[in-house]
Amino acid sequence: MGEQAGGWRAARIAVSLACRECKSRNYKTTKAPDQVVSLKKFCKQCKKHTVHDETK
């Protein structure tokens, strides 16, 4: 799926996801260098589903 024709895999970067409302870093994930990650996840601090943006 993420492999190229030569069998090598593209480099991925580890990022944290921070809640847009309370800025709490709740999740860690990986992404391709050219992507911008923004996901709707459950925030334990806010106790609701909010948008989480990537942080380094």
From Swiss-Prot:
What SUPFAM superfamilies does UniProt report for this protein, alphabetically?
Answer: Zn-binding ribosomal proteins (SSF57829)
Q: Which HAMAP family match?
A: Ribosomal_bL33
GO CC annotation, single: ribosome
| InterPro entries assigned to the protein according to its UniProt record, in alphabetical order | Ribosomal_bL33, Ribosomal_bL33_sf, Ribosomal_zn-bd
What GO terms in the biological process aspect are recorded for it? translation
Q: Which family does it belong to?
A: Belongs to the bacterial ribosomal protein bL33 family.
- Which organism's genome codes for this protein? Sorangium cellulosum (strain So ce56)
Phylogenetic classification of the source organism: Bacteria, Pseudomonadati, Myxococcota, Polyangia, Polyangiales
What's a single GO MF annotation on this record?
structural constituent of ribosome
Q: Which UniProt keywords apply?
A: Ribonucleoprotein, Ribosomal protein
Check the record and name the NCBIfam families matching this protein.
Answer: PRK00504.1, rpmG_bact
Stored Pfam families = Ribosomal_L33
Q: Which residues form a coiled coil?
A: none
UniProt name for this protein: Large ribosomal subunit protein bL33A
Q: Domain of life of the organism in this record?
A: Bacteria
